């Protein structure tokens, strides 16, 4: 694995040890972080459009391979590690995600697969769909499998899940601030493994909209809102090195993080 350390993801000449920030190594060879963000936005938006409109068909296995395939397709123009698990542990604000070294990423993604395949999505009403979707997303968000692009990958995956139901997902109906806050609050409590999806249920109530044609096993082109909502701006995720201790957050209360390292979008 080439990317074993935090610093290895960055061009050395752009990396600032004091902040843990720099420009991620990329297939463009671009050293300017802002320019990279613009280029990434353009290419991944076009790829996302292909996925949500069914122009590219990925096997709907709802497992780790499915999630990696989405990420690999979205970021194939940008990073050589597209579709590959991150090699470092990361956190965002007060949220610390799955410990990749302890095998937690696969464990959480196995739970995602279990939840999706064990649910009769076509029979769910709006409230049931909102609760089931919130639980699936909470586990997927806690996995946070990739160094970059977890949010975009997760939204496409959730749209693939919604294809099984009588609903579509319109992410533009909630602000990025509401989405990010609900996602943060869904993380496990101290010393616990299980995410707490309660904060996400009202969000999915809002973004879940009736599907005109009912459940589908095909991508039906859920509209442009998902592409727009997935990329309203370049999002940043503050990350830090793992301490080697528990990978759950201290609590679900907002607080000031310490030891912030780097930026993940």
Regions found by a protein language model. Name each.
Residues 1-265:
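FIC/Doc superfamily catalytic core
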